[in-house]
Design a protein with these regions (language model features):
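Active-site-proximal, substrate-binding regions of enzyme catalytic domains
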Residues: 2-96, 103, 114, 141, ...
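Acidic, PIN/NYN-like endoribonuclease modules and their adjacent C-terminal/linker elements
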Residues: 45, 106-166
Length: 166
């Protein structure tokens, strides 16, 4: 595994809700996040992720005071949460992929030349690697659409149609 990704809280939360979090760690990607992101999670979500942290599949990075000071001197779009700023900074330091469900963070990463993908991309990878059956992916995407209206409905509908085809 040599590809790295820094992940935000939205990705973890949605995958935990959908019961698919273990599949994120089944991708051929080394998953990282920041302490600031980890601290946004509920106690139950942290407990679930601690299993992956304990076995080395999740890296939670703790910034030094100097790094935190530098992060807060950087120019970010208005309204970008401090935890999301740490995702950008850490990914830039690692020169790696960002996996995020936050539109402001995604746009900032793209503007600054970082590769960035979201939850739909994660689904694509999970299905391509056959970590779940397409029928299960369809069920999970339908559930996702029932509570998360921030996702691109057109992209989800394409996958629902493609993965439902016999």
């Amino acid at each position: 595994m040599n590809r790295l990704a820094v992940t935000d809280a939205n990705i973890f939360i949605d995958l935990i809700i959908l019961g698919l979090i273990e599949h994120l760690f089944g991708l051929d990607i080394e998953i990282h996040t920041t302490r600031e992101v980890f601290d946004q999670l509920t106690a139950r979500q942290k407990e679930i992720l601690t299993v992956f942290y304990a076995d080395g599949r999740l890296t939670v990075y703790d910034f030094s005071w100097e790094e935190l000071a530098e992060i807060f001197t950087l120019d970010f779009p208005a309204g970008l949460e401090p935890a999301d700023r740490t995702v950008f900074y850490y990914a830039r330091q690692l020169a790696c992929l960002v996996i995020s469900g936050d539109n402001k963070l995604r746009k900032h990463c793209e503007k600054k030349g970082l590769e960035v993908h979201g939850l739909i991309w994660v689904f694509d990878q999970i299905v391509a690697l056959e970590l779940i059956r397409k029928t299960i992916a369809v069920e999970k995407l339908e559930k996702l659409m029932s509570y998360n209206d921030r996702l691109p409905a057109d992209e989800i509908l394409k996958r629902l149609k493609k993965w439902s085809a016999k």
